[in-house]
């Protein structure tokens, strides 16, 4: 995906290659509470691990920065990857967590997947202790599709209507 996806006047998805927000992202991924929700371990990222993660995500899907407009400026607040095999989403800036922004992003990506004619979307793993994320995905119709060591996999069947 090579274009900006405008969700509303204050929220957008910026293709990863259009900006370098890795310095800000590193601060998110050094928060051990956030990393535990993402990776299941309380081990902060270093620059090398962050770069490896983004390199992997960029090769396996459409990687975006989640940006929020505040006082006329677009600020990076998280990242998300649209892939048929996984939908990792992180609102990394704590000031923007638990405000429904992840729901808006997820809704937009589900619509985009439908427009592309995809038949399903998968979430490889949500840890059992990540109740907020699981509730968010389930609210859009994702259902459990398997068990993992620390959680569950989810699946959403899409129709093109």
Model-derived regions, located:
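A short, well-structured alpha-helix characteristic of acyl/acetyltransferase catalytic modules
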Residues: 1-51, 161
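Active-site rim helix/loop that mediates acceptor-substrate recognition in acyltransferases
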Residues: 42-61, 70
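Conserved beta-hairpin
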Residues: 62-77
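A short, internal acetyl-CoA/4′-phosphopantetheine-binding micro-motif in the GNAT/acyltransferase core
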Residues: 67, 86-101, 126-127
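Conserved acetyl-CoA-binding loop-helix of GNAT-fold acetyltransferases
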Residues: 98-113, 134-139
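Conserved beta-strand-loop-alpha-helix junction that forms the acyl-donor binding cleft
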Residues: 123-134
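Conserved acetyl-CoA-binding loop of GNAT-fold acetyltransferases
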Residues: 138-148
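C-terminal "cap" of GNAT-fold acetyltransferases
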Residues: 147-161
């Amino acid at each position: 995906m090579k274009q900006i996806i405008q969700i509303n006047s204050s929220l957008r998805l910026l293709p990863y290659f259009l900006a370098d927000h890795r310095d800000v992202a590193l601060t998110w991924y050094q928060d051990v509470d956030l990393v535990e929700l993402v990776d299941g371990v309380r081990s902060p990222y270093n620059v090398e691990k962050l770069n490896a993660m983004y390199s992997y995500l960029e090769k396996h899907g459409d990687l975006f920065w989640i940006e929020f407009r505040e006082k006329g400026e677009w600020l990076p607040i998280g990242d998300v990857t649209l892939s048929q095999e996984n939908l990792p989403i992180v609102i990394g800036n704590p000031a923007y967590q638990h405000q429904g922004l992840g729901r808006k992003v997820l809704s937009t990506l589900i619509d985009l997947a439908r427009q592309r004619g995809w038949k399903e979307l998968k979430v490889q793993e949500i840890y059992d202790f990540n109740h907020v994320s699981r509730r968010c995905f389930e609210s859009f119709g994702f259902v459990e599709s398997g068990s993992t060591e620390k959680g569950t996999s989810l699946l959403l069947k899409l129709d093109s209507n």
